[in-house]
Amino acid sequence: IREGDNSLVSLKDKGYDTVAMHPYLANGWNRSKVYEKLGFDKIMFLNDFKQEKVVRSYVSDEEFYETIISQFEKKEKETPLFVFGISMQNHGGYVNESFENTVKATNLNREYGDLNQYPSLIHITDEALPTFINYFKNYDEDTIIVFFGDHIEFDKYKIPFFIWSNFTSEEKNMGLTSINFLSTMMLEEAGITMSPYYKFLAGVQKQIPAIHAYGYFDGNDYHKSNAVEIANNEVLNDYWLLQYANVFGDFKGSKLFN
């Protein structure tokens, strides 16, 4: 990660204040240095949370949501705010004996502690989420929430996500996609003018809705990818070249990506 690398922190150029928060240790994955290089205006880690509502020694999602809300209550009224938050409550592993599982799997020939604990934790999140959403339902500025995970179901590489806003009542199934397209989807929902790079991603998504490290989904079938197949696929090859330029090229200050 280098200073000025492309990310949604570039919303600062459109007048946004930007906040990154993660209720755990600042040195994990060098997050403190990475967030600083990305240019966030404010960075919050474990010591910046009250730590009054804890689940399995982690800050609960309830407190995490409350802390996000507090940032919106403190912000300047005329200044839009972008918050990137990574929660901690439901992080693995899932065999903490001090935690009381409220969800129990039945009709099994043996006990699977993690099979009970993970859905029990998700249930706690489900109970906290409506209060969070309801706060922004009544918020006096247009607001979008993008909610997704990245740590589960390794065999399927599929996890649920949703994009919610307080200014539209339309519901639609977004279909199968991948995490690299979520930022573009959010910008489109917000009606924010996108850079050429994000416009390119929007075009890629229409032809290849989902991509990950081992393959891609073309809307009909799943394909395992390799260097030869990427080179022979014009869309994938263009994406690979542009992504390489994004990561390794010198485009600081360029409007191509940000």
Per-region residue spans from a language model:
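Solvent-exposed soluble domains appended to multi-pass membrane proteins
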Residues: 1-258
